[in-house]
Structures are given as structure tokens and as C-alpha cells.
Design a protein with these regions (language model features):
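Basic, glycine-rich
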Residues: 3-15, 19-23, 128-148
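Functionally constrained cores in energy, signaling, and assembly domains
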Residues: 5, 52, 60, 88, ...
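Solvent-exposed, charged helical/coil patches
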Residues: 6-76
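Conserved phosphate-coordination/catalytic loops
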Residues: 43-44, 81, 115
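A generic structural signal for short, solvent-exposed coil/turn residues
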Residues: 54-56, 60, 82, 123-126
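Active-site metal-binding core of divalent-cation-utilizing nuclease and nuclease-like domains
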Residues: 64-100
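Basic, amphipathic alpha-helical patches used to engage nucleic acids or provide basic targeting signals
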Residues: 88-91, 95-146
Length: 148
């Protein structure tokens, strides 16, 4: 016979040991991949701005991470595709839920993206919104002055 019993047992043992070693070294091969993961809604920097906006405008509604598609639309699909994945940092609403202004908080990740930011602002401005950009968290007084 090609294999005697001891060779067969050794072969099975080596196969099982190999499978065990591969599963230890590469567990992702044997576990089901998660398709969705939770993530933070806003950064720590943005959360400080959110708190400042709530302090500056206690009688207004402050929304964070609002999709452009909730704010603007266009008849042509190719134009909608230009903004359908874009999100604005904050939207300030009055008591009747009308948009007063859109606020963008530019952290250091925006350096070198000034043209892209200008294009984003232009879309919102063309729809009739006011857009205010800050690179630092402004004082309550500054916010109230800017949103008059």
C-alpha cells in the first residue's frame, strides 16, 4: 500500500496543525468580515464648536454633519453627483427650522483644500445659503456678531 497507518496519522496531524497555525496567524480568513462599523459623528474639535454654538444660540437648533443633499438639489443627476457625498459641519436653524447659516470648521486637514472648499461654498451660496468658515473656535460674542 502507498500509505501505512502511521504515515496516514502523521499526514492528518500535519494537516490539522497547518490549519491551526494558519487560523492563529490569519484569523480574518476564518471569521466573517463585518461590513459596517460605527464611527464618531463629530471630532473632539467639532464637539467643542457644537457646544459653543449651543451656548451662543440657546434658542436655535444646531445640526451637525448635515448632508448637502438635505440642503440642496438640482434637476440634473450629474450636478447632484457633485454634492451627493458632501457633508457640512454645522447648520444653524431658527425656531421655525429655517436655515440661518451654514458653518464650516476648518481644521489643519483643510490646508491645501482651499479651492475645494470654495467650490463647496459656491454650491451652497448659489442655493441661497450663507456660509461662514472658521479655523478656530470663535467666542460666543464673535458667533453672535457673525450670525446677525
Amino acid at each position: 500500500s502507498v500509505f501505512n497507518l502511521s504515515q496516514f496519522i502523521f499526514f492528518v496531524f500535519v494537516c490539522l496543525a497547518t490549519i491551526a497555525l494558519v487560523s492563529l496567524l490569519f484569523p480574518h480568513l476564518f471569521t466573517r468580515q463585518k461590513k459596517f462599523y460605527p464611527k464618531r459623528v463629530i471630532t473632539a474639535f467639532e464637539s467643542r464648536m457644537f457646544t459653543r454654538l449651543k451656548e451662543a444660540f440657546p434658542h436655535h437648533h444646531i445640526l451637525a454633519q448635515v448632508a448637502f443633499s438635505a440642503l440642496i438639489t438640482h434637476d440634473q443627476m450629474n450636478m447632484r453627483n457633485q454634492f451627493n457625498r458632501k457633508v457640512t459641519d454645522f447648520v444653524v436653524l431658527d425656531r421655525d427650522y429655517n436655515v440661518l447659516t451654514i458653518i464650516e470648521l476648518d481644521d489643519p486637514s483643510h490646508i491645501g483644500k482651499e479651492q475645494e472648499d470654495a467650490e463647496r461654498d459656491a454650491m451652497l451660496i448659489a442655493a441661497g445659503y450663507t456660509v461662514i468658515r472658521y479655523t478656530q473656535i470663535p467666542s460666543i460674542r464673535q458667533l453672535q456678531r457673525d450670525l446677525r
